[in-house]
Structures are given as structure tokens and as C-alpha cells.
Amino acid sequence: HQMNDGGEAKREGHITVGDDATLYYAPLPVLPFADSAFRSSFVIDLESTTSRLFYSDVLACGRAARGEEFAYRLYESRLRIKRAGELIYVDNLHFAPAEDGTDMAGLTQYEGYSHLGTYLFVNLGLEEEELREWVGEQLEGVGCLYGLTCFNEDAYCLKVLSLGSEPLVDLQNRIKDKLGRT
């Protein structure tokens, strides 16, 4: 939403996922308005290796239809995931396009794309090569750039750049279907 001069929005959360429980976390895409500032801090505690997680987060470049690509003041997001008390994942995004002069649309950032999707899979019994092949099939011909990383045992991070939120939300829904969740 629009903000008064200097205002900012915050989202903070801490979720504990018990033994033999599954958390599907998939909020609507974040769409920053021009001159907005958003800070998010989230901790997910997985009590054991039987605690399962699918996490999804989609960030738009701004309201592109209004010419507000990367016109926000600040987008800051910190995500920490612990499994059985051990920190296994940290994602710390800090985008301040106007402040630091970074070409957010350019090389090493959004690479000409407008949306960034992050998908995390933890303790879901997935095999890396099978997941990599499946993701490739889902995104074939969609015009996305993506990468999959195994960051711990049975723990994967998928990052996807696209030209719009639709391919990312569609992928999110296909992932939920694959995992047996609707």
C-alpha cells in the first residue's frame, strides 16, 4: 500500500512445526508500491527430521503497469530455518534501489525479469535429480530463469525469475499438487 513519507510496513513471524507435522507456507505475492518500505523477519523451527516444510515467497518488481518498477525505498526480508535446534538456512534480502543505485533489473539482480520466486522444500523425502528434472519440465517454455540448490540433507532451495507472478503462482500450485496438498 502507499505509505506516508518515511513510513514502513513490517511482518514478523515465528512458527514451530511439530514432529510428523507439515507446514505449507505460501502467501500472496508481495507487490511493493513506489516509495514503500517493507521489512519481514521470519523464523521457522522444525522440531525434528520428521517436521516437514514447503515455503514459497514471490516478490514483484513493483507496480509495473504504473511504471513503478523497483521504485520502492526498501525491501528487506530475513528468513531463518532451524531443524532440531540447528540453523540450516538463512536468506537475507536487502534491496534499496533508490538508496544504493543498484540496477535491480540488470545483470546479477533480476536479469531483465520482473518477479522473484523462492521455494523451499525441507524433509519432504525428495531426491535432488528427480526434483531438478520435474522443475525443468514444469518451467519448460515458460521463459523463466531458475536454479535449484541442495543446502542440507533433504533440504532444497529453488529460485525462479519470471516476467510476471502467474508462472510463479502456477508453479507453487503444481508443487502443492505434487506434494499431495491442495
State what each model feature region is.
Residues 7-9, 15-17, 35-36, 46, ...:
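Solvent-exposed alpha-helices and their adjacent loops that cap or buttress functional pockets
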Residues 1-41:
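Intrinsically disordered, low-complexity linker/loop segments enriched in Gly/Pro
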Residues 24, 52-54, 157:
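General beta-strand recognition
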Residues 59-177, 181-182:
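A structural signal for small-residue-enriched, beta-sheet-centric alpha/beta enzyme cores
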Residues 21, 48-51:
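Small-residue (G/S/T/A) turn/hinge positions that recur once per unit in extracellular repeat modules
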Residues 36, 55-58:
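Basic (Lys/Arg-enriched) interaction patch that binds polyanionic ligands
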Residues 18, 26, 45-47, 56, ...:
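Feature marks extracellular polysaccharide-active and adherence modules
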